Amino acid sequence: MRVGVDTGGTFTDFVWEEDGELKTLKVPSTPGNPAKAILQGLERIGIKPEVLIHGTTVATNAFLERKGEDFVLITTKGFEDVILIGRQTRPKVYDFFVEKPKPFVKEENIIGVDERLSAKGEVIKPLTEREVKRVLKFVKRKGARSVAVSLLHSYKNPVHEVSLAKALSTSMELLLSLSHEVLCEIREYERTATTAINAYLSPILKRYLEALEEKLSQTRVFVEQSNGGYMPISLAKHRAVQTILSGPAGGAKAGLSLARYFGIAGVITLDMGGTSTDVCLIKSSLPFTKEYQFDGYPVSIPVIDIHTVGAGGGSIAWVDEGGLLKVGPISAGADPGPACYGKGNDFTVTDANLILGRIIPEFFLGGEMRVFPERSFNALTKLAEKVGLSPLETALGVVEIVNTNMVRALRKVSTERGIDPSSYFLLAFGGASGLHACDLTRKLNLQGFIAPKLASSFSALGLYTASPVFDFSKTVLLPVEDLEKIKAEVENLKKMALERVLSFGVSKELINSLKAQVFLDLRYRGQGYELCLPYQENLASAFHEAHRGEFGFCLEHFPVEVINVRVRLTGEDEPLNLKVESQKFVFSPFEKEVYTKEGPKKFKVIPWDELKKGDKLFGPLLIVDRYTTLFVEEDFLAEVKDGLTIFCYPKRS
């Protein structure tokens, strides 16, 4: 049996299949020990899965909180400050108070090695045995268990990195992150930062995965990567940097599958959980970037282009020094959680939805978890006094602010990139998104929104259906006309990729099923950026056309060069199954008063499981599932389609 498990900041979600039906479970996360929630969930399910595909936030949270492990960074002499200086690019050009990202590497843990290669990979200054001994002595003195090695031009010739790695691994037990293995590409700052982040996080992830592996000794555990595919646990222990968007990637992958199932050209996914919201614009295929900024630092490996904002059900409402009401980015998380959980006293978005009548206390988590509306109201009263509004006005203000924060995130991936969102659907999933989708759809003038039946566990569904993906790249710096050399580099990288995957412990049977996709990074000679295109005939013409589409112009008579060759090995995804479990969460429909911007209104409350394909219902409605609620305003039409997936359309004037 196969299980997809997504560990979020507030809840841990499970998806598995029995007798042809998808089943789900949601349990509170245990941030101090994420494995505990996984084991509790599996115990409740009562199964010992053969395969577990895990979306994890262990490495992500460790970096955001700067709780990784101290490591030694080895660089070429004279380049010790590269990681500290960074790039001069300013995220906000006119901001006079730009803050540099919080450092994660200690300056005293950086050592420069007296060696040098040319840009062509030729040895200018050999790495001497004396230098190697000096490095070994330095690492031993620091007591580090993790080491990052990023030498100048090692992407062209890794000879010195390999020599250092051999000496280090022979003399002591270390986790080694070598830049020519982590990111075999030009640009020393990006390569160094990516390698250093990996060294900082891998010990944390390795300990966590080993503990999980020990508890699940009869289960093959795989870890979801930021590129939407999973990798074996043996590789994940050494490649923590590849898991920074582990959970959200599962949601984006499932979003693409659902869009294809219903024949929809474009969707913007909205994954609103308890801690944050992840958005991703999908048009026919997953969007990838290799310029991802991870809390101020570049991670230049291929990741799904997902934008995250600190707006979730657990986002705390607070008042700043000027008396303005704010929401997030700090979250109450799973413990103590929103005030209504009975442990904390902070008023959150979940508390606001509860007070406004959008969440029904008796149905929270299918009635499995008791909530305390009176605690929400007590926290709201204190907040309202600070703001100077009535409690209900304050609760509405909290919802309006968090919606505005999410609209800003949605515009970040659409209008700010020159894309008109009005032809797109919002794909709303995550436990909280259904309560906010109507307002977001209206604010962005979208076609409508889609709410899958497994909305609250949708990312776990993406993990359940995931396949293995392995990305490899190499800088080649060749003119686009040099077709023979380009072809040779492609074939060499393919061969190396298969050898590397075999070394990860992947079975030959699985390797034989992998399909190779080849991409090239191209640019006009002298440019400082590239466009990634599939390997094809007439590369120059294809690049001119892509450049015109991206930037509005092209230089047809200007030389084009291939910077990087990329090979992606992919497996076959599990087919998307929309048949949900027959064990229904039902109740007799009733009416309930819900407070809206226009005042109190009567909403009909109906169980999601009582709907059937073809049903069309007009709001105002609360459609309640075991783990989520859909808030349908009166100017929206809800239509039920395959798998009890609900399409909601706004009335057009």
Residue positions per predicted region:
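Terminal amphipathic helices with adjacent charged low-complexity linkers/tails
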Residues: 150-195, 199, 566-585, 647-652
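C-terminal, non-catalytic interaction/recognition modules in large multi-subunit enzymes and RNPs
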Residues: 130-134, 138-141, 264, 274, ...
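Short glycine-rich, Thr/Ser-proximal phosphate-binding strand/loop in the N-terminal lobe
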Residues: 5-34, 103-120, 370, 467, ...
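ATP-dependent carbohydrate kinase catalytic cores
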Residues: 34-35, 41-45, 180, 184, ...
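N-terminal glycine/serine-rich phosphate-binding loop of ATP-dependent small-molecule kinases
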Residues: 1-71, 125, 129-148, 162-179, ...
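Short beta-strand-loop/turn "lid" adjacent to the catalytic site in phosphate-handling enzymes
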Residues: 15-18, 23-26, 50-89, 148-161, ...
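Conserved phosphate-binding loops in N-terminal lobes of ATP-dependent enzymes
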Residues: 4, 13, 45, 50, ...
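Glycine-rich phosphate-binding loop of actin/hexokinase-like ATP-binding domains
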Residues: 14, 25-30, 72-78, 98-100, ...
